[in-house]
């Protein structure tokens, strides 16, 4: 029997705003760097009579910026008030979470509708296995992005979140995947039978969201195939087992008893406020990709790879500016940043900022190669050494200390070539009988003998002269 199966997924993505203080008090937000329950005060501990401060302006600015960059309409000249969303859990000392009405609505990102963007406060951290709660995180500002149920596969969800995190990286002042959490809403349609929506709470990685959707799609499909009914419920992701587990029946909005917070005045966003935020908005990754292709004439794939890491994109532009914008210089910058630098960073499992290299290190390296002070092979070794020593030494210092400059003495090169010819008579005979590739082997022997300090084209020239005598 033919099956027609499809899924719909919507995401509720929570990302922390990197502010110095919490959303409604002056407590610091560096909760991971201090002892438990030290960054707290009567406000974030919900002591009787403790009144919250007006919401952190930087957090509101960031919510506006995120909404704008996701194509949302900003809610202008209307009261944006905070509500109390009631539920009982050990990490929520007040018994309610303060969450705003939408700051932005009706957006679109990568073809996925954005229902709304709003602000809320993060709860504390409850560790049920130990029975302890750390309230340092309580009150940290969060931006919540609610998508429409437009995502049709686990792969689409993974790409959507990957691109969203890249956008957060460009915006700045938003903490990345390590602090991101997503609530995953999924329903399955099996042969025309539409199942109920299931929510999987607090999935804390892109990989986790992908695994949840793969598992839930199969679980719900199998239930519907047997003629069963999908329960409308909230489930938890058991990461170790890669399964989801029922927690409780799905709440409705009424279950949370939303009421306006009487301790907080509403905020009103006007056009002037939005304009101030827009002036600080960065170029989006998609716009930067397009500009790189148009301005520098590079391939779209090269642009995508470099733009994926904002630091590398900035390095590329700096290096091109220092070398000059001639086509040859742009090509060299692409090769040494997109290929070689990324290769070494990936091998060491660090990013460019962690390497502590500077753009001028890459510029100097390329200039040493184009000036024939070092060979390309030595250039690759130098870039590896620079990353290993965290940028403490420049390329010039490295090649001087290790004696890696190009051998430009023809006499020295000729001696090395003669030895290679004498030691590899079969390869020489193969070359003389028409096998051009055999010469490459002999070139390799010369390069090995000179520790990569010979220019390959010069070696080829000398070998041909000696062999054809």
Swiss-Prot record:
Matching SUPFAM superfamilies: GatB/YqeY motif, Glutamine synthetase/guanido kinase
Gene designation: gatB
PROSITE patterns assigned: GATB
Superkingdom, natural source: Archaea
EC numbers, comma separated: 6.3.5.-
Family: Belongs to the GatB/GatE family. GatB subfamily.
Species, as recorded: Methanococcus aeolicus (strain ATCC BAA-1280 / DSM 17508 / OCM 812 / Nankai-3)
One example GO MF annotation: ATP binding
Broad EC category: ligase
Any one of the GO BP annotations: glutaminyl-tRNAGln biosynthesis via transamidation
Record's subunit section: Heterotrimer of A, B and C subunits.
UniProt KW keywords: ATP-binding, Ligase, Nucleotide-binding, Protein biosynthesis
Pfam families (alphabetical): GatB_N, GatB_Yqey
Task of the protein: Allows the formation of correctly charged Asn-tRNA(Asn) or Gln-tRNA(Gln) through the transamidation of misacylated Asp-tRNA(Asn) or Glu-tRNA(Gln) in organisms which lack either or both of asparaginyl-tRNA or glutaminyl-tRNA synthetases. The reaction takes place in the presence of glutamine and ATP through an activated phospho-Asp-tRNA(Asn) or phospho-Glu-tRNA(Gln).
PANTHER family in UniProt: GLUTAMYL-TRNA GLN AMIDOTRANSFERASE SUBUNIT B MITOCHONDRIAL AND PROKARYOTIC PET112-RELATED, GLUTAMYL-TRNA(GLN) AMIDOTRANSFERASE SUBUNIT B, MITOCHONDRIAL
Protein name, entry field: Aspartyl/glutamyl-tRNA(Asn/Gln) amidotransferase subunit B
Catalytic activity, reaction form: L-glutamyl-tRNA(Gln) + L-glutamine + ATP + H2O = L-glutaminyl-tRNA(Gln) + L-glutamate + ADP + phosphate + H(+); L-aspartyl-tRNA(Asn) + L-glutamine + ATP + H2O = L-asparaginyl-tRNA(Asn) + L-glutamate + ADP + phosphate + 2 H(+)
């Amino acid at each position: 029997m033919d099956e027609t199966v499809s899924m719909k997924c919507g995401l509720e993505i929570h990302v922390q705003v990197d502010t110095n203080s919490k959303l409604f008090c002056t407590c610091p937000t560096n909760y991971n760097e201090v002892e438990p329950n030290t960054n707290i005060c009567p406000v974030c501990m919900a002591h009787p009579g403790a009144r919250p401060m007006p919401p952190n302006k930087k957090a509101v600015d960031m919510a506006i910026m995120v909404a704008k960059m996701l194509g949302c309409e900003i809610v202008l000249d209307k009261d944006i008030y905070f509500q109390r969303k009631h539920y009982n859990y050990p990490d929520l000392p007040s018994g309610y979470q303060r969450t705003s009405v939408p700051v932005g609505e009706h957006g679109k990102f990568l073809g996925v509708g954005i229902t709304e963007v709003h602000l809320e406060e993060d709860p504390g951290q409850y560790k049920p296995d130990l029975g302890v709660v750390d309230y340092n995180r309580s009150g940290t500002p969060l931006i919540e992005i609610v998508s429409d149920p437009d995502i049709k596969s686990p792969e689409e969800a993974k790409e959507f979140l990957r691109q969203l995190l890249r956008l957060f990286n460009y915006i700045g002042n938003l903490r990345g995947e390590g602090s991101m959490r997503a609530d995953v809403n999924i329903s399955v349609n099996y042969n025309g039978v539409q199942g109920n929506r299931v929510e999987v709470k607090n999935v804390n990685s892109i990989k986790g969201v992908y695994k949840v959707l793969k598992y839930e799609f199969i679980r719900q499909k199998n239930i519907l195939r047997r003629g069963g009914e999908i329960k409308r419920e909230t489930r938890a992701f058991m990461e170790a087992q890669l399964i989801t587990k029922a927690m409780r029946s799905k709440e409705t909005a009424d279950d949370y008893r939303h009421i306006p917070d009487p301790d907080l005045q509403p905020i009103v966003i006007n056009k002037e406020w939005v304009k101030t935020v827009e002036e600080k908005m960065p170029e989006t990754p998609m716009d930067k990709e397009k500009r790189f292709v148009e301005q520098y004439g590079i391939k779209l794939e090269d642009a995508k790879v470099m733009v994926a890491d904002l630091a590398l994109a900035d390095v590329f532009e700096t290096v091109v500016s220092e070398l000059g914008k001639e086509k040859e210089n742009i090509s060299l910058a692409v090769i040494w940043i997109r290929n070689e630098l990324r290769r070494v960073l990936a091998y060491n499992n660090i990013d460019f900022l962690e390497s502590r290299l500077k753009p001028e290190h890459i510029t100097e390296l390329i200039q040493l190669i184009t000036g024939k002070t070092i060979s390309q092979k030595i250039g690759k070794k130098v870039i590896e050494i620079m990353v290993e020593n965290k940028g403490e030494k420049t390329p010039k210092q490295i090649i001087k200390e290790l004696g890696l400059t190009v051998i430009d003495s023809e006499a020295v090169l000729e001696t090395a070539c003669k030895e290679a010819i004498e030691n590899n008579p079969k390869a020489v005979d193969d070359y003389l009988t028409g096998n051009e590739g055999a010469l490459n082997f002999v070139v390799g022997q010369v390069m090995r003998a000179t520790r990569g300090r010979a220019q390959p084209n010069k070696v080829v020239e000398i070998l041909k002269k000696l062999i054809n005598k």
